Amino acid sequence: MATLIYVDKENGEPGTRVAAKDGLKLGSGPSIKALDGRSQVSTPRFGKTFDAPPALPKATRKALGTVNRATEKSVKTKGPLKQKQPSFSAKKMTEKTVKAKSSVPASDDAYPEIEKFFPFNPLDFESFDLPEEHQIAHLPLSGVPLMILDEERELEKLFQLGXPSPVKMPSPPWESNLLQSPSSILSTLDVELPPVCCDIDI
């Protein structure tokens, strides 16, 4: 049942054979694998098999060991150097403080042009104050919606209303009087329509 797969020229040497997975699972004798031009004999293993990377030779382990030793030595040598660094002379310390003082950023007086970037005041566009000539403090404006007055006559009418009082309250024209009869209300709603032309042939 084991099927053999022939490896192409790109993957390995021509003529080398690689056993399929079925052959490895069934344990059909030793098989030859072509890996990077090397031939390795693998014995059949039962159960699940996982391809583990090959063990590194001892030479590479020695190289890694020497690298680790070198880094340990360098870490050890850095310790005493750090202890020697704080011993500076007084002249060097004073030079550093002078440099730090000279590197302080300049004050705001050195850049007066920054204030001129915004030539207008944004609050000017949000002012809702009226000039002193038009006083509206004595007008009954509670609950009045915003009105746009086209003519000055309407503005004069508003000024003539006088101070608000609970006794003299003018009834607004859009509210209907409750004492009126329904017929009088309906008479105000009648609209004259044009006469119907009956002469048109359908």
Curated annotation (Swiss-Prot):
One GO MF term attached to the UniProt entry: SH3 domain binding
One GO BP: DNA repair
Chain segments annotated as coiled-coil in the UniProt record: none
Pfam families from the UniProt entry: Securin
GO cellular component, one term: cytoplasm
Sequence motif D-box, location on chain: 61-64
Span of the annotated motif TEK-box 1: 71-73
Motif annotated as SH3-binding, chain positions: 163-173
Spans annotated as Disordered: 1-92
Modified residues (N-acetylalanine): A2
UniProt modification remark: Phosphorylated at Ser-165 by CDK1 during mitosis. Phosphorylated in vitro by ds-DNA kinase.
Motif (TEK-box 2): 94-96
Domain of life according to the entry: Eukaryota
Keyword Transferase (UniProt): no
UniProt KW keywords: Acetylation, Cell cycle, Cell division, Chromosome partition, Cytoplasm, DNA damage, DNA repair, Mitosis, Nucleus, Phosphoprotein, Proto-oncogene, Repeat, SH3-binding, Ubl conjugation
The keyword Nucleus belongs to this UniProt entry's keyword annotation: yes
Subcellular location: Cytoplasm; Nucleus
Subunit composition and interactions: Interacts with RPS10 and DNAJA1. Interacts with the caspase-like ESPL1, and prevents its protease activity probably by covering its active site. Interacts with TP53 and blocks its activity probably by blocking its binding to DNA. Interacts with the Ku 70 kDa subunit of ds-DNA kinase. Interacts with PTTG1IP.
Entry's free-text remark on domains: The N-terminal destruction box (D-box) acts as a recognition signal for degradation via the ubiquitin-proteasome pathway.
PANTHER family for the chain: SECURIN, SECURIN-3
Protein task: Regulatory protein, which plays a central role in chromosome stability, in the p53/TP53 pathway, and DNA repair. Probably acts by blocking the action of key proteins. During the mitosis, it blocks Separase/ESPL1 function, preventing the proteolysis of the cohesin complex and the subsequent segregation of the chromosomes. At the onset of anaphase, it is ubiquitinated, conducting to its destruction and to the liberation of ESPL1. Its function is however not limited to a blocking activity, since it is required to activate ESPL1.
Protein name listed in UniProt: Securin
Organism: Pan troglodytes (Chimpanzee)
